Amino acid sequence: ACVPVYKECWYPQKPCCEDRVCQCSFGMTNCKCKARL
C-alpha cells in the first residue's frame, strides 16, 4: 500500500503514492510525502 501526500512515509515499507518524494525533516525520522509543485 502506498502513502498519500502529507502522510508519514518510509522506504521500503511505506512508499508514497504516484512516485511522490518522501521527505524527512530530521535524518531518517518524521518523513512525509511531499506534494508536487
Curated annotation (Swiss-Prot):
Entry keyword Cell inner membrane: no
UniProt keyword terms in alphabetical order: Calcium channel impairing toxin, Disulfide bond, Ion channel impairing toxin, Knottin, Neurotoxin, Secreted, Toxin, Voltage-gated calcium channel impairing toxin
Keyword Cytoplasm: no
GO CC terms of this entry: extracellular region
Highest taxon of source: Eukaryota
UniProt cross-references to Pfam families, sorted A to Z: Toxin_9
Free-text tissue specificity from the UniProt record: Expressed by the venom gland.
GO molecular function, one term: toxin activity
Location in or out of the cell: Secreted
Disulfide bonds: C2-C17, C9-C22, C16-C33, C24-C31
Biological function: Antagonist of L-type calcium channels (Cav1/CACNA1).
UniProt similarity note: Belongs to the neurotoxin 02 (plectoxin) family.
UniProt note: domains: The presence of a 'disulfide through disulfide knot' structurally defines this protein as a knottin.
Protein name, as recorded: U10-ctenitoxin-Co1a
